[in-house]
Structure formats: C-alpha cells, structure tokens
C-alpha cells in the first residue's frame, strides 16, 4: 500500500463509476448519495427486500448503516447481507450507536458475523463496544479517542476476519496484516451530521473497484475535508464545499497533502 495505489484507485473509480447499494439512515441519505456522485460513483438507496437479490447481482458493494434502526429494517439488512455473500460482494458496515443500546450492539454483531467479506467503519466508541468492552458514547457520538480503540480494532478484525476503519482526530485502519494511520481531516468535520456515514459510503465505492478500500476512502475524504474546511466559514458551507472538493480532487493534490503512515 502506497500513495500511488490510492491515486490509481481514485482514477479507476471515476472511470468505472461503480454502483453502490446503500441501506442507510434517513438522516444522511442525501449527504451520502451526493458525496458518492461527486466522487464519481453511482449510488442507489435500496431498502426493499423484494429487489435486493436483483440489486446485489449487478452492484459493486453493499453499505449497511444502522443509524435509524428499527424492526422493519433489520430483516432487510440481514437479507441484503445474504445476497451480498451469494454474489461475493463486500459488505461495509457502519454500526452507528453500537454500545448506546443493546439493540444496536446486537444487530451490529449479527451483521458482522454474517458477512463473508466485511469492512467495518466506525468511531472509537463503536469499535470498543463491538469488541465487547466498555465504551464511552453519547448517543451516536464517540467520547473515546481513536488511539484508545486500536487494540479493540485488532480484536474485531481477527474475530470477524475483516478490516476495521476507526474515524477520529487521527484515523486508523486495521487489516489482517497491517495497520495504517492517517492525519488528515479537520476539526470542523464532526460538526456536520453524517460525515462518518459519508466515510462509510465512500469506503463502499472503493470496495467495488479494489482492495484496501478503507485506507483509500479515508485518505480521499481526509484530504477533501481538510481542503473544504479551509474554504469554509462553518459547518454549513463545509457541506457544500466538501462536495465540490470531492468532485475536483486531483492526483497531484491528493499526493501532496496526504499524511499516511503504514504499520503505525
């Protein structure tokens, strides 16, 4: 894994325009769809069980976000994972609020257990809760630092044979054979709702075209968010500027600004 590979993945995504199936929450559907489009992918928000087998037969990846979880959505998520497995597609799980309630923790663990090809993108508290440890969370927001969740991420990666992306002031990605640390992004980003959900959706887009998609998506969003925040007066303008920056992000800028450490 190196910066050149990340640059090549961005170019390939824009060329291939992969279709990403999203079962995501009501709060962020617009944000994540626009971010995927701005980057160059093709989003579809598919929540009907009747069409899921068809959708997963020709999509590139499945993103599951449990942010507005209920008894109607849960069986649909499980069925979607079954179809992703049948079609050998990657499942990207965002266990929003894992640890905040027994329901969220239980469903997140069930999905993680069921998926054959899995990436988990979460904040530190969610990762710690997924590992079965005591996490500090306030609703869906993390009170733990990303640094404190690396050990839990290693455990989760081994338990579910997956990659784990920890979002925070410093981002960490734990895979089966490596650890990565990225120091991009901006302190304003957590003040925009759904920024982590966007991170998850972009991970799904890159999962549709290559390996190590957690690292690639984290790099792209971190650099884009950093640039967008520098041009923004506050969270409102950051939302708009992020879409523009994802659309305009070029290889030279990504290469110059990326702060990546391998085997951190």
From Swiss-Prot:
Catalytic activity: 5-(2-hydroxyethyl)-4-methylthiazole + ATP = 4-methyl-5-(2-phosphooxyethyl)-thiazole + ADP + H(+)
The protein's annotated pathway: Cofactor biosynthesis; thiamine diphosphate biosynthesis; 4-methyl-5-(2-phosphoethyl)-thiazole from 5-(2-hydroxyethyl)-4-methylthiazole: step 1/1
Binding-site residues, substrate: 45, 194
Keywords assigned by UniProt, alphabetized: ATP-binding, Kinase, Magnesium, Metal-binding, Nucleotide-binding, Thiamine biosynthesis, Transferase
Cofactor (UniProt): Mg(2+)
Pfam assignment, any one: HK
Enzyme Commission number, as recorded: 2.7.1.50
GO biological process, one term: thiamine biosynthetic process
One of the record's GO molecular function terms: ATP binding
Superkingdom of source: Bacteria
SUPFAM superfamilies linked to this entry: Ribokinase-like
Listed Gene3D superfamilies: 3.40.1190.20
Its biological purpose: Catalyzes the phosphorylation of the hydroxyl group of 4-methyl-5-beta-hydroxyethylthiazole (THZ).
Record-stated family: Belongs to the Thz kinase family.
Protein name: Hydroxyethylthiazole kinase
Source organism (scientific name): Aliivibrio fischeri (strain MJ11) (Vibrio fischeri)
